[in-house]
Design a protein with these regions (language model features):
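Catalytic-histidine neighborhood of serine endopeptidases
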Residues: 24-33, 51, 74-120, 127-128, ...
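C-terminal cap/linker of serine protease catalytic domains
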Residues: 24-31, 39-46, 208-290
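Catalytic nucleophile loop of clan PA
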Residues: 71, 192-213
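Flexible, gly/ser-rich surface segments that form the specificity/activation loops bordering the active-site cleft
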Residues: 144-183, 218-222
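PDZ-domain C-terminal substructure recognizer with occasional recognition of PDZ-binding tails
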Residues: 110, 252-262, 309-313, 319-321, ...
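C-terminal, low-ordered peptide segments at domain boundaries
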Residues: 126-148, 264-267, 278, 355-367
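A conserved glycine-rich beta-strand in the N-terminal activation segment of trypsin-fold
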Residues: 37-44, 56-83, 105-110, 173, ...
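PDZ/PDZ-like domain segments forming the peptide/carboxylate-binding groove
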Residues: 140-144, 190-195, 199-200, 273-320, ...
């Protein structure tokens, strides 16, 4: 699991209970309770079906070994090849890969490719004569038959399946809800632990809605005399999975590339300006007078910058990216997570040039 630096806030709450001594005249009777049996049966049915397409991933090199989880997303009948999606950090630095099906059954696997930026990797395997008996029991989560319009909403039930803390805990089910939805990642309170990485996150219809990636960790340090010690505290109820549209795009790129997929960078720093929180911002004179409160301003460039070479200037305000309005920094991040170095990006920017306000459309290339 990857580590994240998290700000820590302590607070206290006071619960007040108000009681009345007067008689209760109006009693609300709940006649239609939720049919929890149907929900439980749905979870059971989904698990029985999709878990047959969830596998363990065993990896090793000459100096280390580890394990994670994965999901079978495709089977090619002509070549008898199964395709498994997992996390890039599960296979990173490893040279040997195996797929685990439970009940002490393994199959050797090959690395088709990976996308380190988005933490996605694809493995392939074939069933040999020793494992051919499990072919009929395997399930393929055909994610490319799903509509891209399927939305994930806060409060939606999430089923996560994986191998937490090792392959001995094969296909363990945990449940929770969607806590928040970002452009590339979705947070959930479903229990996620080391070993869950690369496992599937499903909805109550049994559709894969993402690939489990990490659990949030609060990293802090303590000074004791002349010594500084650091510690990590896992944050319960704060796990993340990669959104399905990002996963699908990565898989397409990996299958085309058959190797490492490199994502480009604009080579610039973009600062988010909120004029309500910071009305006297130093960028104030560079912002358009359009009634908005949040802006994204180019504040600096890297030594090698595709954006600068293609005409972006310091203090430019980013308005659109590929024809879509930029409403959050996630919009920029999502664009960069789905393009390759062979692609180009269209930017619309607002700038003040020699005292004149103007809007420019620029094309960023990365070659």
């Amino acid at each position: 699991m990857r580590k994240k630096l998290l700000g820590f806030i302590l607070g206290s709450g006071l619960l007040l209970s108000v009681c009345s001594c007067s008689s209760v005249k109006n009693i609300v009777k709940i006649s239609d309770e939720a049919d929890y049996t149907k929900i439980e049966n749905s979870i059971t049915d989904v698990y029985e079906r999709v878990s047959k397409g969830c596998v363990g991933v065993s990896v090793s090199s000459s100096t280390q070994s580890g394990s994670g989880s994965g999901v079978i997303y495709k089977y090619d009948e002509s070549s008898k090849t199964y395709y498994v999606v997992t996390n890039e950090h599960v296979i990173s630095g490893m040279t040997s890969y195996s797929i685990y099906f439970g009940n002490a059954k393994y199959s050797s696997a090959s690395l088709l490719g990976y996308d380190a930026t988005n933490d996605i990797a694809v493995l392939t395997f074939h069933l040999d004569i020793l494992n051919n008996d499990i072919k009929d029991s395997l399930y393929v989560n055909d994610i490319f038959s799903y509509s891209d319009n399927d939305l994930v909403s806060v409060g939606q039930t999430v089923l996560t399946i994986g191998c937490p803390l090792g392959l001995s805990n094969f296909n363990i089910l945990t449940t929770g809800v969607v806590s928040s939805v970002e452009a590339t990642k979705i947070s959930t309170d479903s229990a996620i632990n080391p070993g869950n990485s690369g496992g599937g996150a499903f909805n109550l219809e049994g559709r894969l809605i993402g690939i489990v990636e990490e659990k949030e960790v609060w990293k802090y340090s303590t000074t004791r005399g002349n010594y500084i010690t650091s510690d990590d505290t896992p944050i319960e109820g704060r796990g993340y999975f990669i959104a399905l549209d990002i996963v699908k795009n990565c898989i397409k790129n990996i299958e085309t590339r058959k190797g490492a997929v490199e994502r480009p960078s604009f080579g610039m720093t973009v600062t988010t300006i909120n004029t309500i929180l910071d009305p006297n911002t130093s960028f104030k004179d560079y912002l358009p007078d359009d009634g908005k409160n949040v802006y994204f301003v180019v504040s600096s460039f890297d030594k090698v910058s595709a954006a600068k070479e293609c005409g972006v200037k310091t203090y430019d305000v980013l308005l659109e990216i590929n024809g879509n309005s930029i409403n959050s920094s996630d919009d920029i991040k999502k664009c960069l997570s789905t393009i390759t170095k062979n692609d180009s990006v269209k930017l619309k920017v607002y700038r003040i040039n020699l005292g004149k306000k103007e809007t420019k459309e620029l094309t960023i290339t990365f070659n």
